[in-house]
Amino acid sequence: MNATFRCFAARKQLKHALLAASILLAAWYSLPPAFAQAYPTKPIRVIVNSAPGGLTDVIGRLVAIRMGQSLGQQLVIDNRTGVGGLLGAEQLTKAEPDGYTIGVVASAITVTPQMMAKPSFDAARDFTPVSLLMSTPLMLVTGLNSPYRSVADYVAAAKASPGKITFASGGTGTMTHLLAEQLQLQAGLKLIHVPYKGGAPALNDVLAGHVPVYFDTLTTSAKLVQENKLRGLAIVSPNRSPALPAVPTLAEAGYPGVQGMAWFAIIAPANTPREIVAKLNEEANKALSTPEIKERILALGGTVEGGSAAVLGDLIRSEMPRWAKLIRDANITIQ
């Protein structure tokens, strides 16, 4: 083999080697980020838009601990309260969509921004749904010293004294508020809204007799009704609760159009890679399937949800226009 041919052959081999290397490199860079390196490689921050001890916080911690054990990285809870629970959600919209900042939120994220003149986020546009966690119906409750023993009693009193009968809520735009607004519209009432900074003070004032009624989550009020510390007037659910079989549904009380539930979910910033979302969804569903979490949610009066990220996305998109209509009809605003 002469020198010229050897040089040509060497150049050809080099060319083939470079081509093969470039193909391998291109294949590597074309891999989704979730597979370019193992996820997660560091702790995950979990923004919870409620105070410690609240229901959003409780369910968030339960699931986060189990997910962290399975993933091999800690999920660190970061409680961000304020602005009706909007502060935490707002911070999540500004986080990097890399899977290392996620959020645990309640259903109010589909409601509260729509009451604002300049909403800071759109729940359907600015977040990536990950997994629904749990849901719970609400129940219209009153104190034991209250004169109301049924929904009919309360409605009759409100009609007899328009603009004088009150109802409590855990804050403007919360489900505890929206259900009362639905009842007010459908029963043709004129009530006075007494908003509180959270469900606990609202419930305390109902127990003390300072405010007559309140739509509370079953997770909080069921035990109080069972212990005869609170009176349940009606449950907002298609069926009666097995835990409180004597309490009728609001439909049975004559108001089938009053509908709504509280739900809790994991979301991530918009544009979070789908492979990371799939991993988080898988881990959330694994956590929800464990006996201890199932039992705890059932003990709280809730329903274990789970399912695909698409299920949560569909729920968010369906809830927003429904609540937007109620907000317009009831002329609900928030500063």
Kindly give the residue locations of the regions a language model identified:
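N-terminal (or domain-start) structured segment
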Residues: F35-R125, K164-T166, T172, G188-V213, ...
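N-terminal secretory signal peptides that target proteins for export/translocation
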Residues: M1-K12
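Extracytoplasmic/secreted proteins, especially bacterial periplasmic and envelope-associated proteins
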Residues: V58, L62, R66, L87, ...
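C-terminal segment of classical bacterial N-terminal signal peptides
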Residues: L19, L24-A34
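Hinge/capping helix and adjacent helix->loop/strand transition within the periplasmic-binding protein
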Residues: K94-Y100, Q114-P201, L250, W263-R296
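C-terminal lobe and pocket-closing loops
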Residues: S135, S221-S289, S318-P321
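An extracytoplasmic/periplasmic, membrane-proximal ligand-sensing/linker region
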Residues: T41-P43, L185, Q226, T249, ...
